[in-house]
Each structure stands twice: as C-alpha cells, then as structure tokens.
C-alpha cells in the first residue's frame, strides 16, 4: 500500500496586536489605565487627556467590618520612615558606647518585618566577638524603645514586654503570660482558673486587654492603621425605588486629538513628518476606540448587575442572589473571560458601602433550601445572628443552622455553617463565649 504523508495547514484565528491591547486595557483599573495613557502620551504628541472633575471619595475605615474588610475593603499603605530609622533616632539619648552601638546596629538590622529578633542572641554575640552578657544588655535597651514589644524573640515575650510597659501593671496578666502562656492562648481557661485561683471573668478581662496589644509591633511602621479614602469606579444611587448608575469620569477617561494635528498636516510638511503624524494618528484613533469600547462593556455589565441584583441595591447585603460570570456573559453575548477582565479591580459605591465588582458574582449557598440564596447572603445572615447573640451563651453551629431555616428558609448543613464561619474569621461558639 502506497502511503503518503500530507502536511495539512490548519488556520487558527489570530488576535491582532490592537485586539490584544484592547483586551489588556479592559482589565486595567483606574490607576493602571491612567499610567498607561500617560506613557502613551509621552510617545505620541497627538494624545491629550480630557480634563475631568474630581469625584467624591468613598470613606472606608480599615478593619471596619469582617466581611467588608475581607471581601470589599481595599487597603492603601502610607509608608513612613523605617523601623530601623526610628530605633536609631531613639538610641541617640541612650549614650551607648562604641561596642554597644555596634551591637545595637547589628540587632536592629536582624529584626524581621514584625519587629521580632530573628537571630539567636548568643549567635549574634559570637559574630560580633562580644560576650552573650553584653549582647543581652543591649537587647534589653533595644526592648525598652518604642514601639513596645520591639526586639522580642517570641509572641510570648512580645506580649509580656508590652504588659510590663502599661501604666497600670497587672500582675495576674503578667503571671498568666509568663507561666501559663500555652494554656492561656489555647483558652483552657477553666483549668487555669482552678490552677491559679483567678476567676474566669478576670481571665476573660485579661484576654480582652491583651487583644488590644500589638502582636507584631514592627508592622506599626510598615502598615499604620488609618482611615482610607478610596475613589470608586461606579456610583450606585437609589431614589424612590429607582436604581441609577453613574461612572466616575476619572476611571473612564477620554482623550482628545491635539489641536495642532490638522494644522501640521495642512502646512505642507515633509513626507517624513506626514508619515509620522499619520502613524501617531492611527495610534490615537485606536486608543480612543479602545477606551470607548471599555466604557461600553463595563456599562453593559453594570446595567445587567442592577437588573439581576436589584434586591441587593434596594434591601442590602442579605438580599444578594447567586450569580455567575457565565450567566452575565451569555446574556450580553460576551465571553466569560471578557466579563472577568472587565470587573477585575473595579469598585462600586452603593448605599450599603463600597464593594468590589467581583463581590456581586456570588455562588449559590451549599444545599440552600430556597434555591435562591447566595453564599454571600448566607454569610451576612450568619454574621447578623452572631453579632446579636448572647455572648454568655453563644450560638452553636447547629443552632445557627436552625435559625437560618426558621428565619430565612435557608437550609444548609452544620458543616457548611462552620465553613462559612471560618471563611469570615469568626471563632467557634466556645471561643466566643464570655464569662461575665
């Protein structure tokens, strides 16, 4: 049999460079887009950004709410001077000897980002050719500086250093941390109460006081707690039951053609200049078209979200419905990946706070009895129930299961409740229990 190999050419659709760039542009958030346009305008004199009014900023307080902080919160950093700089500045008042300065500088550069001493003090002494006693003495001076707890070698030491610096020292708290730290941290409080004679409610108070301390003092320099103001990409308002969306013009910029372009073309410029300007004009036209397409795509998605999540905008978080990217993509005749790129990093200001767009795409709750409850809505109900519980008799996971069904017709398993609770960083009923 005469067999011949034949080469078959398979034609595959190829994305043009302009299309690839347009797809990338769709996924940019406002800051990335602004930077991209600025870079292009440096290379293309025909591109001029249209001036826009500055929109209102959205107030977002860090650690304001468990679910908001995790699912909707976008935290910004505000870098200050480094921890090492601050410690060096404080050391100027300590009158250190040259040897002590050498040890001090070595130790502060051996601190990790949390402010803990990474290196064994005896190893540090060996490296510096000093005695362990000298190194320990300088470490004690380092640990006397601000922030309290700096230079600790363990969480236990960090907390103890801070307790010892409190204006009103609590001997019972210091004793629990120094002699019974593991049992205290594991909340074996009933056993501790029997062994130490400290009442349960007092141990609870001590735990509350310790919770207000800083387990990672070094982060006070890297990520100071602050109130943050965020610029939303979309504003949703509700008036008399009517939901309206407004785009932030800074998040959806437009560009103008430099007014001298046509003048230069009609001024009898040389062929090289005309060719250059023509190429730059094509770049300008592509960018203008891509920005317009980005705006149209996101607007269509927003309008679809308003339709499908109407109850959320009218009633709040607990009314969030299950919704997938594919559902919206199919309805708008878009690819699922297009919707995913379009919502990436975009934020919406609603009457109930600031949220990332991706939040509105929430899966159906596991084994939901009513068939129309999203996992986000169920988490909201769980959070509300736990916030309202009697802390001396916290609700068990099974009781939460029962209340979800009784109050909202939502039927999920105890395991699912535990899973959602863990995702929200809410401790178990035993850990939530108060002893007073």
Swiss-Prot record:
GO molecular function: DNA-binding transcription activator activity; nucleotidyltransferase activity; sigma factor activity; transcription cis-regulatory region binding
A Pfam family hit: Sigma54_DBD
Keywords, in A-Z order: DNA-binding, DNA-directed RNA polymerase, Nucleotidyltransferase, Sigma factor, Transcription, Transcription regulation, Transferase
RPON box, short sequence motif: residues: 413-421
GO BP terms, alphabetized: DNA-templated transcription initiation; regulation of DNA-templated transcription
Induction behaviour: Association with RNAP core increases slightly during late sporulation but not tested stresses (at protein level).
Keyword Transferase: yes
GO CC aspect terms: DNA-directed RNA polymerase complex; protein-DNA complex
InterPro entries documented for this protein: RNA_pol_sigma_54, RNA_pol_sigma_54_core-bd, RNA_pol_sigma_54_DNA-bd, RpoN_core-bd_sf
Keyword Protein biosynthesis attached: no
DNA-binding region extent: 324-343
PANTHER family from the UniProt entry: RNA POLYMERASE SIGMA-54 FACTOR (PTHR32248:SF4)
Family: Belongs to the sigma-54 factor family.
Listed NCBIfam families: rpoN_sigma
Known function: Sigma factors are initiation factors that promote the attachment of RNA polymerase (RNAP) to specific initiation sites and are then released. This sigma factor is responsible for the expression of the levanase operon. The open complex (sigma-54 and core RNA polymerase) serves as the receptor for receipt of the melting signal from the remotely bound activator protein LevR for the expression of the levanase operon. Associates with the RNAP core only in stationary phase cells.
Subunit and partners: Interacts transiently with the RNAP core.
Entry protein name: RNA polymerase sigma-54 factor
Organism: Bacillus subtilis (strain 168)
């Amino acid at each position: 049999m005469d067999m011949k190999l034949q080469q078959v050419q398979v034609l595959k659709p190829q994305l043009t460079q302009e299309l690839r760039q347009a797809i990338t542009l769709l996924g940019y958030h406002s800051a990335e887009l602004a930077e991209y346009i600025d870079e292009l305008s440096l290379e293309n004199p025909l591109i001029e950004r249209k001036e826009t009014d500055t929109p209102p900023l959205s107030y977002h307080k860090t650690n304001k709410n468990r679910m908001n902080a995790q699912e909707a919160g976008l935290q910004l950093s505000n870098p200050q001077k480094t921890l090492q700089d601050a410690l060096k500045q404080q050391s100027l008042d300590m009158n250190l000897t040259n040897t002590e300065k050498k040890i001090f500088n070595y130790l502060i550069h051996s601190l990790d980002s949390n402010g803990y001493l990474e290196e064994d003090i005896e190893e540090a002494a060996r490296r510096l050719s000093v005695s362990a006693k000298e190194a320990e003495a300088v470490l004690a001076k380092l640990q006397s500086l601000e922030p309290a707890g700096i230079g600790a070698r363990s969480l236990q030491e960090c907390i103890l250093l801070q307790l010892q610096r409190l204006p009103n020292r609590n001997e019972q708290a210091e004793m629990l941390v120094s002699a019974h730290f593991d049992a205290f941290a594991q909340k074996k409080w009933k056993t501790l109460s029997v062994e130490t004679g400290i009442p349960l409610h007092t141990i609870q108070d001590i735990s509350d006081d310790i919770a207000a301390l800083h387990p990672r003092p070094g982060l006070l320099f890297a990520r100071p707690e602050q109130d943050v103001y965020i610029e939303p990409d979309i504003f949703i308002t509700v008036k008399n039951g009517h939901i309206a969306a407004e785009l932030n013009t800074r998040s959806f910029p437009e560009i103008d053609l430099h007014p001298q372009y046509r003048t230069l073309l009609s001024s009898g410029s040389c062929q090289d200049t005309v060719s250059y300007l023509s190429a730059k004009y094509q770049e300008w036209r592509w960018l203008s078209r891509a920005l317009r397409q980005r705006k149209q795509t996101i607007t269509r998605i927003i309008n679809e979200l308003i339709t499908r999540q109407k109850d959320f905008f009218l009633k709040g978080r607990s009314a969030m419905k299950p919704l997938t990217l594919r559902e919206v993509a199919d309805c708008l005749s878009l690819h699922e990946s297009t919707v995913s790129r379009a919502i990436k990093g975009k934020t919406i200001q609603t009457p109930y706070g600031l949220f990332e767009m991706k939040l509105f795409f929430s899966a159906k709750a596991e084994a939901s009895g009513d068939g129309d409850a999203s996992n986000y809505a169920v988490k909201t109900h769980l959070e509300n129930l736990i916030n309202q519980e009697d802390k001396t008799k916290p609700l068990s996971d099974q009781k939460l299961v029962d209340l979800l069904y009784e109050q909202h017709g939502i039927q999920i398993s105890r395991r699912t409740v535990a899973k959602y609770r863990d995702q929200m960083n809410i401790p178990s009923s035993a850990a939530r229990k108060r002893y007073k």
